[in-house]
Amino acid sequence: LLHARADGADVRMVYSVSDALELARANPERQVVFFGIGFETTTPPTALGILEAQRSGLDNFSVFCNHVLTPAAMKAILNVAADAGEGETLEVDGFSGPSHVSVIMGSDAYRFCARQYHKPVVIAGFEPLDVLQAILMLVRQLNQGRTDIENQYTRAVTPEGNRKAQAAVAEVFELRPSFEWRGLGAIPRSALGIADAY
């Protein structure tokens, strides 16, 4: 994008998809493309922006979608660890689950770690004491030989997550067959694309 801007393209940093929608409304003669990136936390606002653009007939607004999925990346890492050959080392003892991502997904989304890979997950909040407590909880699980999904961030994360946000994402997006991750390579079913209806 910096190169495009240097070549004369009108590239603007916006705080949110709402800002991009406002740019499209204010400039009906110009095509406004929102670069939708990020994990589960940033995906629902993009979905709502797409729905708003469709509802309001905003034909000069589009999204370049690069929303990715945390569980798929975790599975890819765990699969690499499981397939490590002699002389290769990639040991994963457990995960500290990301807080805001988990608010959307819910703690149940990590069950595969315990069931399929026998790895514990502790969802941590943002505050220093949250992080320390989550690390302690994870170390206790490891010391006790447990592989549970625990939620340190109970003040914000529920088992089911944010159902309204999940519904908006399910309506607007669909799984891509594969996505190329920087540093990880292609990971199957690890990103979202915009459904044909949008």
Residue ranges and their predicted role:
Residues 2-4, 48-55, 78-82, 110-116, ...:
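Short, solvent-exposed amphipathic alpha-helical segments in soluble enzyme
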Residues 133-198:
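Internal helical hairpin/lid segments
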Residues 84-159:
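A conserved active-site cap/scaffold subdomain adjacent to cofactor or substrate pockets
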Residues 20, 71-77, 107-110, 168:
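Glycine-rich, charged/polar anion/phosphate-binding loops
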Residues 1-27:
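The feature marks the mature, well-folded catalytic cores of soluble enzymes
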Residues 20, 40-43, 69-73, 102-104, ...:
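Short gly/pro/ser/thr-enriched loop/turn and capping motifs at secondary-structure boundaries
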Residues 26-36, 41-98:
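Active-site histidine-anchored catalytic micro-motif
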